[in-house]
Amino acid sequence: MLTMRICLRATYTQKEYKWESTVNEQISAASLYDRVARVIPKAEWMGFQDDVEAILELKRKRNAVILAHNYQTPEIFHGVADIVGDSLALARKAMEVEADVIVLAGVHFMAETAKLLNPEKTVLIPDMAAGCSLADSITPEDIALLRKAYPGVPVVTYVNTSAAVKAASDICCTSGNARQVVESLGVPRVLMLPDEYLAKNVAKETSVELIAWRGHCEVHELFTADDIRELRESHPGVIVLAHPECPPEVVDAADFSGSTAVMSDYVGRERPARVVLLTECSMSDNVAVHHPDVEFIRPCNLCPHMKRITLGNIRTALEENRHEVTVDPAIAGAARRAVERMLQI
């Protein structure tokens, strides 16, 4: 049975979004609330206000910026983030950051990627335990064995991996550019790691033979085709959008599939009367604020790793320089090349 959630708040999301006010402009949490009043109840905001004020001041003092993934909660996304987006957007924007300090409000592989692209900057992650089931599913040793089993076949690695795994790969991809990356190699066969479902879903869109691994996202693997049938019965006319990390039978049963950025674009372009986004809970909240005329049906699969990031530990990270992210110099160069090669496409 699909668990449903009624959510009374939403947040902004785009492929990238930057507050007009950044680290150099004086803002107070009180004045900021005018921007978020429609998405965060006043009583709840009052509990966040001290941390928001402190973080805004710390950003000014330290010349810091906060990059936040689309799955972050509203008080982070609205209250303190400078740049928000999906994995691809954050990787691209990380290359343009001019601040001295980057705080990555997301999971560990994202912070590592930011460090790879900004080796001279201080990169902090508020909670070092904010991991990823996909990143944990594969090691450099696994890739070495795969290269022996498939000699000469290039390795495309999802960005949801450790720096060590990226270093053992030829090029990275995200859910938003996977097909383009695979086809850019100009070869008939590719090892596409580690997300089995992403590889199988991309394989339906390309003539390139994709050899998959057995990793899965613990959020997206929970969705089923039965969930979609239940949603259609309970909510006639609903348009179903599925993330490509969902099982292939889920993607097949959906009306449309794409990354979080692509889903957001779809809603803005098509303006469905009723829609469900099969991805992490916060994504529906994020998109809904732009489209008050669209009814969002919210299945609830939370990412426990993303939700480890809080205003409190963002504040502590900035106050104490806690959880600075480092990448072993022995692998940093190769990992950076794999990411940069992706960004050139």
UniProtKB/Swiss-Prot annotation:
Enzyme Commission (EC) number: 2.5.1.72
An example Gene Ontology molecular-function term: 4 iron, 4 sulfur cluster binding
Pfam families tied to this protein: NadA
Keyword Nucleotide-binding (UniProt): no
Positions with a binding annotation for iminosuccinate: H69, S87, Y158, V159, N160, S175, H243, P244, E245, T260
InterPro entries cross-referenced by the UniProt entry: NadA (IPR003473), NadA_sf (IPR036094), Quinolinate_synth_type2 (IPR023066)
Cellular location(s): Cytoplasm
Biological process, per Gene Ontology: 'de novo' NAD biosynthetic process from L-aspartate
Listed cofactors: [4Fe-4S] cluster
Catalyzed reaction equations: iminosuccinate + dihydroxyacetone phosphate = quinolinate + phosphate + 2 H2O + H(+)
Keywords: 4Fe-4S, Cytoplasm, Iron, Iron-sulfur, Metal-binding, Pyridine nucleotide biosynthesis, Transferase
Residues holding [4Fe-4S] cluster: C132, C217, C303
Similarity annotation: Belongs to the quinolinate synthase family. Type 2 subfamily.
General function of this protein: Catalyzes the condensation of iminoaspartate with dihydroxyacetone phosphate to form quinolinate.
PANTHER family on file: QUINOLINATE SYNTHASE, CHLOROPLASTIC, QUINOLINATE SYNTHETASE A
Protein name: Quinolinate synthase
Lineage: Bacteria, Pseudomonadati, Pseudomonadota, Alphaproteobacteria, Hyphomicrobiales
